[in-house]
Amino acid sequence: MNTQTTPSPQFYLTAPAACPYLPHEMERKVFTHLVGPRAAEMNDILTQGGFRRSQNIAYRPACESCRACVSVRILAQEFEPTKSMKRVLAANSDVIATEFAAQPSSEQYSLFRRYLDFRHQQGGMSDMTVLDYAIMVEDTHVNTRIIEYRRREEGSGLEERPKGELLAAALTDTMSDGLSMVYSYFNPALERRSLGTFMILDHVRRTKALGLPHVYLGYWVQGSRKMDYKTRFQPQEHLTPRGWERFDPSSMPESTHD
């Protein structure tokens, strides 16, 4: 009897490089390609195991002397917004969110560039071209969508792409157990709207509506101020050597970063 076996994914290790989050640390990553008919299934398994997706690559930290990067996921069905989060929702009551296929636009790239130039001038993405952005959005073999957030105008919702200024966007994977926020960006001039927080709250709402348990936020690095905001969304679980465990935020200082 002939049996067919599905090839196992091949994993690779990057060379050491300077850590973008913690000074004096070096990072390494283990990665594999997400391609073929099992790409979506593998993305589910690997994300639940602490990997992140970037284009058709799934990766996770494999640093020799540091374990600071911790995978975080919100328990969406138990989540209730805090008073400050309710204020964020109220401040963005004029925003309409629309989901599209993972296709880039010049309008998206213009906003993406404004975000990078303001928030990540020295980061590894700072020199991304319009072609780089298009590849980031389109190069996916899993169930990926892009969600646009626009200021609501008269007639919005009656067309395929609503009218109104594009305020923010999120590249999102739908998985068997929830949503994974691959990358999000927003207009940095609209600080009072806390659009970063608003997009996470919207993903929690969407996950609840789907009847799924988790919103994956990527990595949290204790000691990195730019990551502190992720611990505000409770309850949440962190991936430990013992598996996913509920996180106790009582020891963490409250952050106002959005």
Curated annotation (Swiss-Prot):
GO cellular component: cytoplasm
Protein name listed in UniProt: Aspartate/glutamate leucyltransferase
Function: Functions in the N-end rule pathway of protein degradation where it conjugates Leu from its aminoacyl-tRNA to the N-termini of proteins containing an N-terminal aspartate or glutamate.
Pfam family, one: ATE_C
Taxonomic source organism: Rhizobium etli (strain ATCC 51251 / DSM 11541 / JCM 21823 / NBRC 15573 / CFN 42)
Family per similarity comment: Belongs to the R-transferase family. Bpt subfamily.
Entry keywords, A to Z: Acyltransferase, Cytoplasm, Transferase
EC numbers: 2.3.2.29
Keyword Glycosyltransferase in annotation: no
GO molecular function: arginyl-tRNA--protein transferase activity; leucyl-tRNA--protein transferase activity
HAMAP family attached to this UniProt entry: Bpt
Biological processes annotated in GO: ubiquitin-dependent protein catabolic process via the N-end rule pathway
Catalytic activity annotation: N-terminal L-glutamyl-[protein] + L-leucyl-tRNA(Leu) = N-terminal L-leucyl-L-glutamyl-[protein] + tRNA(Leu) + H(+); N-terminal L-aspartyl-[protein] + L-leucyl-tRNA(Leu) = N-terminal L-leucyl-L-aspartyl-[protein] + tRNA(Leu) + H(+)
Top-level taxonomic group: Bacteria
